[in-house]
């Protein structure tokens, strides 16, 4: 996943808020995913903002360390491959 990508939740996926972040359930293939609270701003952005912009904002506010951003992008790419999120073009 690139910092310039914008992502949105797949139409067949529902989020349920939890203490740790959220549960994402895919109605398409009945898979359940645990979404860490640090991923919620990216997954729940509806494609309105670039993932790099969201990451920069979280780093500036102290909610995320800069060193964690590459790992987060890798996790987002994994969620894209599994159909949880899609890159908005």
Where are these regions (language model features)?
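Long, low-complexity, charged/polar intrinsically disordered regions in eukaryotic proteins
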Residues: 1-30
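Long, charge-rich, low-complexity alpha-helical segments
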Residues: 28-89
């Amino acid at each position: 996943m690139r910092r310039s990508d914008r992502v949105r939740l797949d139409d067949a996926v529902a989020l349920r808020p939890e203490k740790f972040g959220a549960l994402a359930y895919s109605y398409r293939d009945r898979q359940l995913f645990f979404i860490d609270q640090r991923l919620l701003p990216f997954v729940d952005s509806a494609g309105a903002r670039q993932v790099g912009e969201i990451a920069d904002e979280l780093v500036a506010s102290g909610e995320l360390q800069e060193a964690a951003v590459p790992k987060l992008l890798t996790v987002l790419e994994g969620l894209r491959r599994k159909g949880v999120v899609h890159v908005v073009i």
